[in-house]
């Protein structure tokens, strides 16, 4: 590896760390905002999105830990941990959304939830794109996989936003728990990809 290559790699690593620290900070703030909004609106979608933020914090911590070490076993462990985080999220959302739909539970409107999920969707899509580019440049599968976690976070934010807007505007209460099923689909797909690759 030349000096120029080493400098380029160091710059990419710094970018990777910066993206993960930004994600951590955003999701820590998100847990506080979503906790208040979910309780006030009694919304399963906002509660589930808060759990997703907690899992995203864990996934970012895994990547920071992995980037601080060497490749090989640390990458394999990192990918497995992210896979387990996906599994926890999928099980929670599947169970919670099903219970709420079966019970016919009606959440309240949440202006705070609408604003936060709209801004979060834009932020997560931007961070996910940055992680994907940086992960490819570093040939780092953990950063690339966590980038997909962040992308799913953005998709969930958009789905929750749609559910909140439909509930507030049209009274479609079922759109709130139905939003949880969107993430379950993507989470299961990522779990299969991570573990079928033999990590």
What is each of the regions a protein language model found here?
Residues 1-199:
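Alpha-helical transmembrane cores and adjacent cytosolic helix/loop segments
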């Amino acid at each position: 590896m030349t000096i120029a290559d080493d400098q380029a790699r160091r710059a990419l690593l710094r970018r990777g760390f910066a993206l993960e620290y930004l994600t951590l900070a955003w999701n820590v703030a998100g847990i506080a905002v979503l906790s208040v909004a979910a309780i006030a609106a009694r919304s399963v979608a906002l509660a589930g999105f808060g759990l997703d933020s907690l899992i995203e914090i864990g996934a970012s911590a895994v990547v920071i830990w992995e980037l601080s070490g060497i490749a090989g076993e640390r990458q394999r462990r990192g990918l497995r941990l992210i896979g387990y985080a996906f599994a926890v999220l999928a099980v929670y959302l599947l169970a919670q959304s099903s219970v709420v739909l079966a019970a016919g539970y009606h959440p309240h409107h949440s202006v705070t939830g609408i604003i936060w999920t709209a801004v979060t969707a834009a932020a997560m899509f931007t961070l996910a794109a940055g992680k994907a580019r940086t992960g490819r440049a570093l040939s780092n599968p953990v950063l690339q996989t966590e980038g997909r976690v962040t992308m799913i976070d953005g998709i969930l934010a958009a789905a929750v936003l749609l559910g909140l807007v439909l509930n507030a505007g049209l009274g479609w209460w079922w759109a709130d728990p139905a939003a949880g099923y969107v993430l379950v689909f993507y989470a299961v797909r990522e779990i299969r990809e991570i573990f079928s690759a033999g990590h």
